[in-house]
Amino acid sequence: MQTQLTRFVGFSIFSLIFLHACSLVPSKKQSKLVWNKDLPVIGSQSSPRTADLNNDGTLDIVIGAGKNEYQESDMGILAFDGKSGELLWKQKCRDQVFGSATFCDANGDKIKDVFIGGRSPQLKAIDGKTGALLWEYNAIRYVNDPILRFAQFNFNNSVLVADQNNDGVDDILTVNGGNSYAAPYSQQGRMPGVLMVLDAKTGNVIAADTMPDGKESYMTPVYFSQPGSDEKYIVFGTGGETIDGNLYISTLRDLLSKKLTAAKIIATEKGHGFIAPPTIADVTGDGQLDIIAITHGSKALAIDGKDHHVIWTKTFPGTECSNSFAPGYFTDDDVPDFFTFISKGQWPNSTGSIQVLINGKDGSISYMDSIGCTGYSSPVVYDLDNDGRDEAIISINNFDCSLGYASKPPRTMENRLVYINFAKRSTKTIDQSQGFKNIFSTPWIGDLDNDGYLDVVYCQYYHHSDLLSFLGMRMRRVDLPVRVRKNILWGEYMGSNANGVFSPNTAKF
């Protein structure tokens, strides 16, 4: 194993200097690989998120991980030093931890703690400084509870909500659902998803309710308020890859009162559900946040935030989508647009990836391409060349896409980290690695060390005979010669504030 791992370490970044050579921005330095961390055996379906855990002024990286599905590992949740890439701490898991971290100082030590979930069902709070377990959700405790007895499956990503029990700490909103043993198209064994609020200090459940339609849920809930309003809204979804679903809007008040039956259906889909979390952004220019979603059946919708009428729709027949939209100012107006990629065919016989940019104003297609094979990471966004129009950074896999995920494995595999310049309709490579793949992890971009330049942190996974199995992984930090001149609006999975809300006034700089 070690021979195979070390074999590929020097195999990358043939084009890391391209950013300097093409003079994206005036710069005093070239791109450089700051560090590379190899980890044998394990892999990840999580995405990196950052917080300064050792109080050294540089953001550190947390990611969920594990071995293959249903396997235990002592490397289930990992924290890496942002300066060196060395492991700060690790937490064990009994199954894959595929969620991405939520940060909140729950123990009052001035260092943000980590909340993260995964399969079987796992939801943990971890001391951000030491890696010690603060609390863990215990499903056995609730086997006789009329609602929580259904929360025995996957914990997806969580988001912070305002303090609900007056202990001075924000609390956790999350969803549990999705029975991996349920057969496709069958309703048997598909328990209702459970939306819940937990005390961030103790893990006690403050409130919970089942999905109004009784269906499963895989979607991370999105929590927001409209400008000028104190009402707190929750958008959540139901259904799966082969099961009908609905998109709902409700209020935190209704969840706290166990009245999710009062939630309003704002979209529905037959034969597919809502899996990717929606993006919240103003596309009408009325100052109110709208809801932009895409179903697993690749029907994109913009829904008005005031009265919930459908503003526009766009459907992509013969494709599927589990990837979130990344919003940005990609076209020549001041209305945010929405970029993602969708998969040709039907899982597991997906035969390629289509990159799609939807104009936020009217739902028209502003850009479309087909590079690489199917993957389930999401884009991140920044104006790399400082021309006033954003670019998107994505991870793609190159292999024989016609093989899909169910047939014999591809003999060769290449992972590329690329950026798309929509104004010039060009794609450029940031990093390229033979023998690696990335099926799930979204990159992170931001100023990790506060030096005024953009960093990118991303994961790659050693190619295995089974595309979805793990053989080991590596995490890499590259320092780009791109000055951070403006707010980073969408620099990680679900945005730079990790909540799915596109808000230029609250983005990270």
Feature map (PLM): residue ranges:
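Bacterial Sec-dependent N-terminal signal peptides
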Residues: 1-29
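Beta-propeller-forming repeat regions
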Residues: 22-509
